[in-house]
Design a protein with these regions (language model features):
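Basic/polar, cationic surfaces and motifs that engage anionic cell-wall
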Residues: 1-23, 32-36, 123-131, 135-199
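N-terminal catalytic cores of peptidoglycan-degrading enzymes
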Residues: 1-123
């Protein structure tokens, strides 16, 4: 349970009032983090469902609570949450679990540099990587500015809590893990740039 407390402190320090902890977030529902009790990366997903794909901060679909149904689905639809975090369009990060959940599915980083150096066995991504679901329809690059800022801060909080030295091999897309997926629509360079820019 030590990692949960460390992660909580890091998230609050980085995100302030833009983080909310869901019921049971600190409960270990599956195995501990592999291989050494902390995750080795943060895997990026999009929900493929959202109230809007407008990036206008004043749009009703980008206000807090507008996508509560999506957040509740990630939290409650399966036996364990479908991601560790959901990032709403207003920039709020909802923490579902500090421990391994089911989000990565089958896949492999074999031959995929630099992620092949993480040592994640085939189809075992759930036990090694945190996952964040970004609320987005996923048809185009529609992340809001608030989401990009919070993604950067979330990545830094995960780095702080997990002891990563940097971001080069720590922020893969879901499609980096498996060719079955298209998320996210953003490049690895973009993801890394937000982590560097928004701390």
């Amino acid at each position: 349970m030590k990692y949960a407390k460390t992660l909580q402190a890091a998230l609050i320090a980085r995100l302030g009032n833009k983080v909310e902890f869901m019921p049971g977030w600190d409960k270990q529902r599956r195995v501990p983090w592999q291989p050494n009790g902390v995750p080795v990366a943060l895997l990026f997903h999009h929900t493929a469902g959202a109230a809007t794909e407008s990036t206008n901060s004043k749009h009703p679909g980008n206000q807090k609570g507008a996508n509560r149904g999506v957040i509740n689905f990630v939290q409650n639809h399966y036996e364990v949450p479908a991601a560790n975090f959901t990032l709403d369009r207003d920039g709020t990060v909802y923490v579902h679990s500090a421990f391994p959940v089911w989000h990565a599915g089958k896949g492999s980083f074999k031959g995929v540099k630099p992620f092949d150096t993480l040592g994640i066995p085939k189809d075992m991504g759930n036990d090694y990587m945190l996952g964040v679901e970004v609320v987005s329809k996923g048809r185009k690059r529609d992340f809001t500015h608030a989401q990009k800022v919070s993604l950067g801060k979330l990545a830094n909080a995960c780095k702080d809590a997990s002891g990563w030295k940097g971001f080069w091999k720590r922020l893969p897309n879901h499609r980096t893990w498996t060719s079955r997926k298209v998320d996210t629509r953003y490049s690895l360079t973009a993801l890394r740039s937000w982590a560097t820019l928004y701390r």
